[in-house]
Amino acid sequence: AAMREAMAAADVGDDVYRDDPTVLALERRTADLLGKDDAVYMPTGTMTNQVAIRTHTEPGDQILIDANAHVARAEAGGPAALSGVMTKGLPGIHGVFTAEDVHAAAMPVHPFTPATLLPPTKLLCIENTHNGGGGTIWPLDAVEAVCAAGRQHGLRLHMDGARLWHASVATGVSEREYAAPFDTVSVCFSKGLGAPVGSALAGSSELVARARRFKAMFGGGFRQAGVVAAGALHALEHHRAGLAADHSKATAFAGGLSRITGIGIDLARVQTNIVRFTLAAMPSGAFVERCHDAGLHLLTTGADGVRAVPHADISEAQIQKALAIVGAVVSEQAA
């Protein structure tokens, strides 16, 4: 209710002309939290990531990224279509790769291969937390190590921090500390924070000015954007601390799943608010459909994989109800 009231009362203007006071306030607050000069508000996290790639690269370049990262697998082929770049997948473990992986990928394929035959490697991206890895947190020392390796090869650095708020709450490492090594950082105001619309891209004044051009090119211009920016600003100021409760609900749900015969889960991988598990004897599609019919909404992650994401609107009682639904569906299949 408080977020809706803030949105209804928002001062608005025209973001295209940069005279929307609420958007400007959101951009200033985001830049300050991340320790950057400036930030630009956009409709989606996919747009902030793709604008960042276009800002840092030219067609024919190559970017280094975990092979299962959102940018590489779930942004509609944007790097190729919008920036004309290649993605070189790094062999991360649940999304986390090493400095050695960066060195190996950034080196020429063969010392005698002419440089003119190779795509210039320009950008290194990480995703923190890592969605495909199950909400995996990058430790700060691992972030600093891979960024240092990237700098050794002259690479620019971008962090897809759509869920950075989760990493910060879980570890106690501030968003500013996590963002410090990077040229640009994207953050999302809906992932856990509960705003209806929007992400922001933060960086130096020069990079953000360049990014604003590509925001316009990619169709990201708003008019009375303050209405949705007010929701994002409210979420930023009031909802970050509540993420710890979401993590506790995920831990409780995962623990309950581990006691259900026919469910496979690695509890060590449940680090934030994403719970991934496998089914021993039932296709995930049929399982998710049965759960949906019973009032539990889940996603498939492959033939036998399932993903659940507790959030602020889910109560502890609903976690127990969800476990009961899962147990009933699995038992029915076994019978």
Regions found by a protein language model. Name each.
Residues 1-10, 14-281, 285-294, 298-314, ...:
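Conserved PLP-enzyme active-site core in the AAT-like
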